[in-house]
UniProtKB/Swiss-Prot annotation:
One of its GO terms (molecular function) is toxin activity. One of its GO terms (cellular component) is extracellular region. Transmembrane segments: none annotated. It is found in: Secreted. It comes from Heloderma suspectum suspectum. This is Helokinestatin-1. One of its GO terms (biological process) is blood vessel diameter maintenance. The keyword Secreted applies. Helokinestatin antagonizes the vasodilatory actions of bradykinin at the B2 bradykinin receptor (BDKRB2) in a dose-dependent manner. Expressed by the venom gland. Keywords: Bradykinin receptor impairing toxin, G-protein coupled receptor impairing toxin, Secreted, Toxin, Vasoactive. The keyword Secreted applies.
Amino acid sequence: GPPYQPLVPR
C-alpha cells in the first residue's frame, strides 16, 4: 500500500 505518516503523540 501507499506509505503513510504514523500519528505519534508528542
